[in-house]
């Protein structure tokens, strides 16, 4: 597929070790050149108590951009959790980057090959993720984050 690497890291290659296979991918850094923090770091750490103030005004937009990207390119996520999403603030337009948990974990990954099924699964997992992490209010989904209807 022609999927741009705007919200997932660039793929560098496959690493094969005895009994293991791994993927080498782009390292997402923050403005200072350190590994970018995850949403989990921001939401549950003493070091980052809550969403960074510099991004709070655009929080809904950050989540909407990530959802739109997953939905548009039918990128099914099997493990949508806060620790798998990094905050890339290197540019004037910060973004969320999904670094792990991509793909279907079913024996027959129908959602990966049938966009209609994939998009239904993406929306269902997204809404569950937003509500589970209290990023939406459970009603309209507009006060604390972005939820699809």
Residue ranges and their predicted role:
Residues 7-14, 75-89:
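A short glycine-rich, hydrophobically flanked beta-strand micro-motif that places a catalytic Asp/Glu
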Residues 1-12, 114-117, 122-123:
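A conserved alpha-helical element in kinase catalytic cores
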Residues 29, 82, 103-104:
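Short, glycine/acidic-enriched loop or turn micro-motifs at the edges of active sites
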Residues 1, 39-43, 122, 126:
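Generic structural signal of hydrophobic/aromatic residues within well-ordered alpha-helices
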Residues 5-59:
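Conserved structural core of kinase catalytic domains
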Residues 46-63, 69-78, 87-149:
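C-lobe/activation-segment region of protein kinase-like
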